[in-house]
Curated annotation (Swiss-Prot):
Constitutively expressed. It comes from the Eukaryota. LRR repeats lie at residues 681-706, 708-731, 732-754, 756-777, 778-800, 802-823, 824-848, 945-968, 979-1002, 1004-1027. This is Disease resistance protein Pikm1-TS. One of its GO terms (molecular function) is ADP binding. Residues 282-570 form the NB-ARC domain. The HMA-like (RATX1) domain is responsible for the specific recognition of AVR effectors. GO terms for biological process: defense response; response to other organism. Interacts with AVR-Pik through its N-terminal part containing the HMA-like domain. Residues 191-264 are annotated as: HMA-like domain. It holds the Pfam family Rx_N. Keywords: ATP-binding, Coiled coil, Leucine-rich repeat, Nucleotide-binding, Plant defense, Repeat.
Length: 1143
């Protein structure tokens, strides 16, 4: 709450941060404020601090409906004043010494504070929270059964089947499909017929080519007596987008027919089928209906309530009143449940308030009565609109579980509640209400228009605005109904001109809060909006900058929030983004195995745009915007979003004042005969031009010269710039620089002069190296160079003492500088899809919060624990320089990415190096390659290492005699891995008493039936065999060893022992239960995941090639096997990086 209280908000503007800035100005003795100006500033600070202390607990602390407070005239004045004061402080700081001595920056603001704030706040009271209409609180009764229930039949049948028959879907969650879902249902495919005036074969060819290239189209043909019809057959066709494309590219197109055709789609249906449980059919006792506001949750719940009502002894339909905290009317809700449950069951209703006491006692009395009454009855309980988990917990306690077939249906718009239900109760099935498909949406919208008699005036082809309504509503039933009704009201004004039509439709969008016929839709959206705390409302309102056709890039939006001052830390902002997803305002598409993207429903965006306009928070101008209204607005434009198609010349030709605009976001290519007039934006702090193809090098130079003094965020991702100009050094206050996906090939030396830079993102560029001047960026906490040709990081990165995130993913980097160990605040190091297999041992000094992402996995590798201090204190300074040559931290090895990094001794050795024995006894893990045997004194040293938990022994040549492990030492060891042609090892009684994991990596060699002795490993739980991809698991030496371990596993006292056996790509898990039938035969084993092929290869060490270095006991002749695999790894890594870059 404290962080939120100091942030910029939609209600109080920049009040909190500007007070901090003003205090710093007054405390700075070098600012040369004149006495009069100092007095003005102190007065302003004193008055506004009093206002802030009054507003903070009353507005920021409330989570209810404080919308009236945010729109209050006095609070609006304070909000605007805070922005102007922020500008005034920055204006003063830009002046030179002489100019400051004669300036009077705060005189006018002081007068405003006296006149408009001080005298009015003495008797000001927070406006009373306005309550939503009672119809919103309690939605009793059903809507009239008419054509408005389009698309509900399929949902009803699916839900009835779940309640009556249960589900074989092991996930217990029916996910909402993205908009325009696949149309494969019951083996049917779509047949769509369009009518298009096509005058010649050229236009027909153009139409057929366009249709044939559309996703989901299986066949296309020309039909009709005049050859003016296009017949399309396919599945998952976005018919609305297709007809729009035909109208633009060929001519006015219109639907003639949409129907289903029978096809054999068994193969496709199998691909789309949900994951089934093997032998179970789960009973569903509770259904949680999850969906967006206006998505039809309540409607389908009511339909079910009436359709199934006669099958139950008693039934209840109760709605929860939305509130900022668990409902104060929950006792009333329980009483309502009790009263409804008794209807038709008993002649005389019990008094729900029959118990004595109030508050919790009365609530508990009702819970007990409801539970006792329902215990022996078959019931149907519908609870509509759960807003708080605490509410559901209380209600759930009152509903007893019995075996009489009782069913519970609940609805919610909050993902977090649905997920918790799903996690806490195995009897719950989550049913996400999806969008109406385009055909049903079209039928609903067109039906409303024709029923009103306006259908013949809407027009056909490109003039039919129902197409645009359907496109904008994304299948949301409530929006389709009310927007179509509003369209009927506007129909007389619609004309054929595209721009005029867009303007009229934009008027409908922008009128969600004002047009009377849209009030039911507005009320539904207001419920969710008023449920948000103020800081989330601010972040959500900022999303109104997007057009509904834009996808939201999470990182881009989160960092703009930071630049705007809404949030201070990226981790905090990421959490807020996730909260907006959980509350249903932002929708995530994709999963953990695919690209994720985010979007906000178009109707919700329209609502947010209206709210943003009310607060003068953000002005959005796009195709169809009424520029005259924007120009005549009495309030200054604080934040501006220009969307594709907007004629930016209007900014110059109109009287629109953008001199106080602090944020400019340009989405897409705007209509620009002369370009964006950046000279008009005198106080810009955030400039986002990402993906704007009109921005080139010359524009960037002008931007740096005109906007140099205040810009904190500069987004140039996806533009056509090729070079960052030297004028970049003028951006003295720049904090975030995005130049990814551009054509730049180098960073200028002047980058070092951006002293306040916090985030530098150059991903997907042609940059080959980082300049040495990067060491000057002492405030940098994020450095992202992924997908660039960079092959080496300069040692100067070690000077970036505040760096928290470093991403070198998919680059040519193969080794990190030792200076990385000096980055004490580093939290995330991403080296996935690089040649980096090891970190310098100095990285062990970094905070234990560091997460290393390696290989091709999102799982983090933690650094070894508990040795940093011992390493630092136990090694003399003169010796530390040599440590890098004898020790590193392996983050990927032949066994794949470990969960914890392993200290590794590079190269091959005859014996364990003396430096390891002298200085590194404290290690918790060790990985070493020996030539062909483990000497007795070396084994004794390993056995006596006090902290050793993980040990990896690799043998260059096959040991002549088995290595014997007796019952002495290795008291802490939990994981032991052996890498050898054939594992020649034997465990004696009481060996390695705490060992849980035994892992072998082997190739081929002479077969041996010698016992390994795993029965002597008393704590053993798992044995893993990893066979080299160059050999098969049925090779004699390999299969013989596996057979020995199988037999011993059957005799182990800890049965079952898990055996994992693979041969290169796909892993198969088997458990020994005393029968060899449970263990996969070696000849039938598949291979391990492809990603592991290159991950499991050894690291490349250039340090020792051609340098003649021979460390303690190192063998110079036993490196052939290692060299072969190193060269193979290089080839694999080359292919991998090229693939990543081109994709």
């Amino acid at each position: 709450m404290e962080a939120a209280a100091m942030a910029v908000t939609a209600a109080t503007g920049a009040l909190a941060p500007v007070l901090v800035k003003l205090a710093a100005l007054l405390d700075d003795g070098e600012c040369n404020l004149l006495e009069g100006s100092r007095s003005d500033a102190e007065f302003i600070r004193s008055e506004l601090e009093a206002v802030h202390s009054l507003l903070t607990p009353n507005i920021l602390g409330r989570m209810g409906d404080d919308d009236a407070a945010c729109k209050d005239g006095l609070i609006a004045e304070v909000r605007e004043l805070s922005y102007d004061l922020d500008d005034a402080v920055d204006d003063f700081l830009e002046l030179n010494f002489e100019q400051r001595r004669s300036a009077s920056p705060f005189g006018e603001l002081k007068a405003r504070v006296e006149e408009r704030v001080s005298n009015r706040f003495s008797d000001w009271k927070l406006p009373a929270a306005s309550l939503p209409p009672s119809s919103v609180h309690r939605r009793a009764g059903l809507p009239p059964p008419d054509a408005g229930l389009v698309g509900m039949h399929k949902r009803k049948e699916e839900l009835i089947e779940l309640l009556e028959q249960g589900s074989s879907d092991a996930s217990r969650w029916r996910k909402r499909k993205p908009h325009v879902p696949l149309r494969i249902m019951g083996g049917e495919m779509q047949k769509i017929v369009f009518k298009i005036p096509m005058v010649d074969d050229k236009s027909r060819t153009k139409a057929m080519s366009l249709v044939a290239s559309t996703v989901g189209v299986h066949s296309v043909a020309i039909a009709g007596d005049l050859r003016d019809q296009v017949v399309v057959v396919g599945d998952g066709i976005d018919s609305i987008n297709l007809v729009s494309a035909l109208r633009k590219k060929v001519g006015p197109a219109m639907f003639l027919e949409v129907s289903q055709v029978k096809e054999d789609v068994k193969e496709i249906t199998a691909m789309l089928a949900p994951v089934k449980s093997i032998c179970e059919f789960h009973e569903v006792k509770t259904i949680c209906i999850l969906g967006l506001p206006g998505g039809g949750k309540t409607t389908i719940a009511r339909v079910l309530y009436h359709a199934l009502g006669t099958q139950f002894q008693c039934r209840v339909f109760a709605s929860i009143s939305p509130s900022s905290s668990p409902s104060p009317n929950l006792t009333e809700t329980l009483a309502d449940i009790f009263a409804q449950a008794q209807l038709g069951v008993t002649d005389t209703l019990s008094t729900p308030y029959g118990g004595s006491g109030t508050g919790r006692a009365l609530q508990q009395h009702l819970i007990d009565n409801i539970s006792a009454f329902l215990l022996n009855k078959k019931y149907l309980i519908v609870i509509d609109d759960i807003w708080h988990w605490e509410e559901w917990e209380v209600i759930r306690k009152s509903i007893p579980k019995n075996d009489l077939g009782g069913r519970i249906i609940m609805t919610t718009r909050l993902n977090s509640i649905a997920e918790k239900c799903h996690t806490d109760d195995n009897d719950v099935f989550v049913y996400e209400v999806g969008d109406l498909d385009n055909n049903d949406a079209w039928s609903l919208s067109w039906g409303i228009a024709t029923k009103s008699g306006a259908g013949n005036r809407i027009g056909t082809g490109e003039d039919n605005s129902c197409y645009d309504i359907v496109n904008m509503c994304y299948g949301m039933p409530l929006a389709l109904i009310w927007l179509s009704s509003a369209l009927v009201g506007e129909i007389e004004e619609l004309g054929g001109a595209e721009v005029k039509k867009c303007r009229d439709l934009r008027h409908i969008e922008d009128g969600i809060l004002d047009i009377p016929s849209l009030q039911p839709l507005a009320e539904s959206l207001c419920l969710g909006y008023n449920h948000l705390p103020l800081y989330l409302r601010t972040l959500l309102l900022y999303c109104s900058a997007y057009h509904w056709s834009n996808r939201i890039e999470r990182g881009r939006l989160v960092r703009r929030w930071i630049a705007e001052g809404f949030v201070s830390e990226e981790k905090e902002a990421e959490g807020y983004f996730g909260e907006l997803i959980n509350r249903g305002w932002i929708t995530q598409h994709g999963d953990n195995n695919s690209y994720n993207y985010y979007e906000i429903h178009p109707v919700m965006l329209a609502f947010l745009r209206c709210k943003s306009k009310e607060y003068n928070f953000l002005t959005c101008l796009g195709l169809g915007s009424d520029t005259s209204t924007s120009a005549s607005s009495p309030r200054l434009i604080r934040r501006l979003s220009l969307q594709g198609g907007y004629p930016v010349d209007c900014l110059s030709s109109m009287s629109m004042d953008v001199s106080h605009t602090c944020s400019l976001v340009v989405l897409g290519d705007v209509a620009r005969p002369k370009g964006i007039p950046f000279y008009m934006f005198k106080r810009l702090r955030v400039l986002d031009l990402e993906d704007n193809k009109d921005i080139q090098d010359s524009h960037l130079q002008g931007i740096c010269e005109q906007l140099s003094l205040r810009v904190r965020y500069l987004g140039l991702k996806g533009t056509r710039i090729r070079k960052l100009p030297q004028e970049m050094r003028k951006l003295k206050h720049l904090e975030i620089l995005y130049v990814g996906s551009t054509r730049i090939s180098e960073l200028p030396q002047e980058i070092g002069e951006l002293k306040h830079l916090r985030i530098l993102d150059v991903r997907n560029t042609d940059i080959t190296e980082l300049p040495l001047q990067i060491r000057e960026l002492q405030h940098l906490h994020t450095l992202d160079v992924r997908n660039t040709p960079i092959s080496e990081l300069p040692p100067q990165v070690g000077k970036l003492q505040n760096l928290k995130i470093m991403c070198v993913r998919s680059t040519g980097v193969r080794e990190l500088p030792k200076e990385i160990g000096e980055l004490n605040h580093l939290q995330t190091l991403d080296v996935r899809n690089t040649r980096v297999r090891e970190l310098p041992w100095q990285a062990g000094q970094i905070s234990q919060s560091l997460r290393v992402l390696a290989g091709d996995s999102g799982d983090g590798v933690r650094l070894p624990e508990g040795v940093c201090e011992a390493l630092i204190n136990g090694i003399p300074g003169a010796t530390r320089a040599k440590c890098r040559e004898v020790l590193s931290i392996a983050i990927i090895d032949r066994f794949g990415p470990p969960l914890v990094g392993i200290f590794k001794v590079p190269g091959s050795h005859m014996r364990i190096p003396k430096m390891i024995k002298d200085h590194f006894r404290v290690l918790s893990c060790l990985d070493i390659r020996l030539c062909h045997k483990l000497e007795d004194d070396d084994q004794k040293f390993l056995a006596e290492m006090p902290n050793l938990q993980t040990l990896v022994l690799r043998f260059e040549a096959l040991p002549r005699q088995p290595i014997t492990i007796n019952g002495t030492g290795f008291q802490m060891l939990e994981s032991f891995r052996v890498d050898s042609r054939v594992p020649r090892i034997a465990f004696h009684e009481d060996a390695m008493p705490n060992l849980k994991l035994l892992e072998f990596k082997f190739y081929a060699g002479p077969a041996s039936n010698d016992a390994i002795g795993i029965t002597n490993l008393k704590s053993l739980q798992k044995v893993v065999f990893r066979c080299s991809p160059w050999y098969k698991s049925d090779a004699p030496g390999i299969s013989a060893t596996i057979d020995v371990v199988k037999k011993e596993a059957e005799e182990h006292p800890n049965r079952p022992i898990t055996l994992l056996i693979n041969a290169g790509y796909k892993e198969i898990s088997t458990e020994s239960h005393g029968s060899s039938e449970n263990i996969a035969g070696s000849s039938g084993i598949d291979t391990e995941p492809a990603q592991a092929q290159h991950d499991n290869l050894p690291a490349v060490r250039d340090d020792y090639k051609g340098k003649g270095i021979l460390l303690d006991g190192r063998c110079p002749t036993c490196g052939r096997a290692t060299k072969i695999e190193e060269e193979t790894q290089d080839r694999v890594a080359d292919i991998e990086i090229q693939t990543e870059t081109t994709s």
